[in-house]
């Protein structure tokens, strides 16, 4: 069986082409690139954080079914579930399915999100700016600082503008992750598996298991529920 899984982000669209349990092709496209492409007329499951772009996706992939939070079989223990993004629930479900009931999910993209699944329940987390967005905003707002693109920069002291900017942004992100992991381990007195995903996930792979297809694997796992979604 051939089908697609689609993850619509704030600035890109990720598409996986599956044949059974294997990914045969994977595309990461900007919104502009996506609109120029043609796709096979296959059934598809998708999630979207950018509803304004979802109908354009439907125009290119007519057989897509966008999933809702309630489609993912995971208990949500969150103060404002009505404002919780489907992407966070989808990632929490996927992490629980493949990595166990106590897991931290780090999703690195436009936003850097770190969420906690505790005893199989989604509990919440923290959200901050992604690495690329930090660099872009700094360049836009600070005259004289050029725009740099994300890199993994492990230095103890920046000695050029490039090193200072990249090192500062990267260290801010890594310290955010380190301090959160330390806090949760102390508060909840547990060891957590840590899984990293997202377009910028490779820069933080040292913190755990890097799984760039995490949410796609979760959606594939839901395919047996397709006719009930």
Curated annotation (Swiss-Prot):
Gene: coaX
Protein name, entry field: Type III pantothenate kinase
Location of this chain's protein in the cell: Cytoplasm
EC number(s) given by UniProt: 2.7.1.33
Required cofactor names: NH4(+); K(+)
Molecular function via GO: ATP binding; pantothenate kinase activity
Function of the molecule: Catalyzes the phosphorylation of pantothenate (Pan), the first step in CoA biosynthesis.
Species this chain originates from: Aquifex aeolicus (strain VF5)
UniProt catalytic activity: (R)-pantothenate + ATP = (R)-4'-phosphopantothenate + ADP + H(+)
InterPro entries xrefs: ATPase_NBD (IPR043129), Type_III_PanK (IPR004619)
Keyword Kinase appears in the UniProt entry: yes
SUPFAM superfamilies: Actin-like ATPase domain
Assembly with partners or alone: Homodimer.
Binding site for substrate: 78, 85-88, 161
PANTHER family, sorted: TYPE III PANTOTHENATE KINASE (PTHR34265:SF1)
Keywords: ATP-binding, Coenzyme A biosynthesis, Cytoplasm, Kinase, Nucleotide-binding, Potassium, Transferase
GO cellular component terms given for this protein: cytoplasm
The UniProt record lists the keyword Aminoacyl-tRNA synthetase: no
Residues noted as binding ATP in the record, renumbered to the chain: 7-14, 110
């Amino acid at each position: 069986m051939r089908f697609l899984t689609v993850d619509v982000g704030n600035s890109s669209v990720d598409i996986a082409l599956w044949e059974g349990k294997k990914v045969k092709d994977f595309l990461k496209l900007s919104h502009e690139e996506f609109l120029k492409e043609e796709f096979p007329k296959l059934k598809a499951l998708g999630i979207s954080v950018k509803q304004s772009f979802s109908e354009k996706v439907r125009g290119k992939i007519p057989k897509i079914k966008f999933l809702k939070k309630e489609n993912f079989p995971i208990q949500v223990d969150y103060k404002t579930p009505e404002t919780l993004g489907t992407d966070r629930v989808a990632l929490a479900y996927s992490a629980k399915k493949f990595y166990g009931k106590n897991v931290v999910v780090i999703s690195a993209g436009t936003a850097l999100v770190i969420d906690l699944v505790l005893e199989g329940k989604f509990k919440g987390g923290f959200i901050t700016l992604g690495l690329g967005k930090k660099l872009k905003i700094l360049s836009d707002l600070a005259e004289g600082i050029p725009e740099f693109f994300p890199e993994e920069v492990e230095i103890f002291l920046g000695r050029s503008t490039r090193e200072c900017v990249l090192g500062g942004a990267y260290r801010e992100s890594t310290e955010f992750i380190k301090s959160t992991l330390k806090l949760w381990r102390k508060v909840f007195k547990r060891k957590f598996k840590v899984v990293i995903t997202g377009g910028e996930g490779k820069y933080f792979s040292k913190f755990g298991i890097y799984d760039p297809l995490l949410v796609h694997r979760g959606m594939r796992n839901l395919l047996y529920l397709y006719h009930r979604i």
